Amino acid sequence: MAATTANPEMTSDVPSLGPAIASGNSGPGIQGGGAIVQRAIKRRPGLDFDDDGEGNSKFLRCDDDQMSNDKERFARSDDEQSSADKERLARENHSEIERRRRNKMTAYITELSDMVPTCSALARKPDKLTILRMAVSHMKSLRGTGNTSTDGSYKPSFLTDQELKHLILEAADGFLFIVSCETGRVVYVSDSVTPVLNQPQSEWFGSTLYDQVHPDDVDKLREQLSTSENALTGRILDLKTGTVKKEGQQSSMRMCMGSRRSFICRMRCGSSSVDPVSVNRLSFVRNRCRNGLGSVKDGEPHFVVVHCTGYIKAWPPAGVSLPDDDPEAGQGSKFCLVAIGRLQVTSSPNCTDMSNVCQPTEFISRHNIEGIFTFVDHRCVATVGYQPQELLGKNIVEFCHPEDQQLLRDSFQQVVKLKGQVLSVMFRFRSKNQEWLWMRTSSFTFQNPYSDEIEYIICTNTNVKNSSQEPRPTLSNTIQRPQLGPTANLPLEMGSGQLAPRQQQQQTELDMVPGRDGLASYNHSQVVQPVTTTGPEHSKPLEKSDGLFAQDRDPRFSEIYHNINADQSKGISSSTVPATQQLFSQGNTFPPTPRPAENFRNSGLAPPVTIVQPSASAGQMLAQISRHSNPTQGATPTWTPTTRSGFSAQQVATQATAKTRTSQFGVGSFQTPSSFSSMSLPGAPTASPGAAAYPSLTNRGSNFAPETGQTAGQFQTRTAEGVGVWPQWQGQQPHHRSSSSEQHVQQPPAQQPGQPEVFQEMLSMLGDQSNSYNNEEFPDLTMFPPFSE
């Protein structure tokens, strides 16, 4: 029962064991059951503590695994450490290897750059790519393949090698030679050595270059031909860059293969005759102007200075083999110097061109604002004879002609105002041998760019050749005085269509006037031109109290027009006559019209211009003109010869009062010779200071008759009693009146038809002098009109 009771428990506890127990035998089953029970009892704790048992076993396994893992980890860490060390060492070794490789490559690149001349000539060290590129170019140039194609199909377009060689030698003005660097033996020399050194080619072949140069230049030549690195000591002059380089790595570059050579040496000059036909023109000139080193003694060789320029090349060239009989055939690859020798003709002391050198004709000087020399060019010695120290500190005006000193001062003042613009002036400069030289000075100022102040004046002084034939220039602000021809006395109102008949009429009238050559030599720029006035101011006198040409304003106009005596101040205002109207046409008659409130006096007029004195007096001129113009009139009023004092500049100013009159009266007063007779109105008697008054002429139609008692100085000057007087002079009129003066009323006479016109050229010369003006009142009018007007 116990077994049976135990079995359910066992089956309940262990379901998997139930079928096994039920299927067992009885006998053995009891024993087995007891055994099973015992095993079951033994297993129960085991089953109760299954986890523990399993845990214990697991713990044991974990311990074993942990130990093994630790061992494995330790072993693995050792392996990893060893591998990391190996990798690190490998990386370090690789970096070291790369660094060594880079250092080697840099060293080779540096050495290559030292061997290539174009790399060393650069201002700074080039990069590696540039060094390699230049090295390739240099190697191509050494092999002679720099300008040829790789397939060898390149050929010159139209020149052969010989033609190209001759052109190069002629352009280089020298001869080509090739010498061995080791021995100095001449390998080749061109035929152009004959006109250069007067030596045939045969004298150079078979000899050495040391035999052809001066003995003192042998050592220098040996240094230039040497290719060893230690041959050159000291400093090197790089002719391409113009810099002096110290001894060092650059020396190896200069002495290696392919480096450039340029040196000067003295070479032997032969005595062979040169045929000018067989050589070119430059060679013939070279033969005559060879650069000798002084006089040559008999029996001594003659040396000349030769400039040699070339390169060190490999010999023999690539692809060329020397013949077996050549002494240098078995020595392997050698070097040679390929160079061109040229004469130093420009420094020849005995050249014939030196005697024909033109002396300098200009020098540059610097002055302060006052004109004192602060710098003088050395060419002043050949130009004016002075040393620079003789001119420094002195004023340029001191060396100027007295007549040109003011002109030079004005030019310096003007150039200061121009501020940088060039001003030229010509003056006479006293040279050291006390001769006057015409100098043209072009000057301009230099301004400080910061302070804008004038620092100094720079002058270029040029000695002018044939100065007597050149006109003397003036400043830009100097008044020009051209000498005009017979058209100078045309009034401004004259139209262009009236010019031809006007000139013909004036030429006819001037042919019968004595001394007419003097009338055409006056300057029209000094004549007062008529002024066009409009509005109510046309009838107002000017309020200026000082005449335009008064003596205190411009002394040049103090001497003015003697021997012209008429009321020519009564010109026509330009506003009253159109430009196309014929002036002073013959045959015009003017009706008699009274002229109220006007004072007309017989006066000698002195217009403010300078004119050459005619040979005859004005009275004789008037008499001859009147006799020629109307010989039928016979009434003769006599002029009383009197002595009259000369007028002053203030009396000239009395002519400037503006009195208004109509055009017909202005023109009519010049239509007949009687208008030049003495006339007066009540209240305005004629007066002549210190002399008797003119007798009145009652016959207005009479003409002037010739007088035999008149002298040349009879009517030289008269009092300037013109149309009116200035307002401040009106109160002084009683002082100038004469007690014996008579009053007459002038009646304008009617002109006879066909009566010729006289004194038109005088009227047109004077223009309208009834108004005095200046540039301040009429700013748009020029006081001195140009010749074209």
Swiss-Prot record:
List compositional bias (Polar residues) regions by residue number: 1-14, 465-481, 708-719
What protein is this chain from? Aryl hydrocarbon receptor nuclear translocator
Subunit note: Monomer. Homodimer only upon binding to a DNA. Efficient DNA binding requires dimerization with another bHLH protein. Interacts with TACC3. Interacts with HIF1A, EPAS1, NPAS1 and NPAS3; forms a heterodimer that binds core DNA sequence 5'-TACGTG-3' within the hypoxia response element (HRE) of target gene promoters. Forms a heterodimer with AHRR, as well as with other bHLH proteins. Interacts with NOCA7. Interacts with TACC3.
Q: Where is the composition biased (Basic and acidic residues)?
A: 60-97
GO biological process, alphabetically ordered: cell differentiation; cellular response to oxidative stress; embryonic placenta development; negative regulation of inflammatory response; positive regulation of endothelial cell proliferation; positive regulation of erythrocyte differentiation; positive regulation of glycolytic process; positive regulation of hormone biosynthetic process
Q: Does the keyword Transit peptide apply?
A: no
Domain (bHLH) spans 89-142
InterPro entries (alphabetical): bHLH_dom, Circadian_TF, HLH_DNA-bd_sf, Nuc_translocat, PAC, PAS, PAS-like_dom_sf, PAS_fold
Its encoding gene is what? ARNT
Residue ranges constituting the PAS domain according to the UniProt record = 161-235, 349-419
Give all residue intervals belonging to the PAC domain. 424-467
Q: Where is this region: Required for heterodimer formation with HIF1A?
A: 112-168
Q: Name one Pfam family in it.
A: HLH
Q: Which GO terms describe its molecular function?
A: aryl hydrocarbon receptor binding; cis-regulatory region sequence-specific DNA binding; DNA-binding transcription factor activity; DNA-binding transcription factor activity, RNA polymerase II-specific; nuclear receptor activity; protein heterodimerization activity; protein homodimerization activity; RNA polymerase II cis-regulatory region sequence-specific DNA binding
Q: Where is this region: Disordered?
A: 1-97, 465-492, 672-789
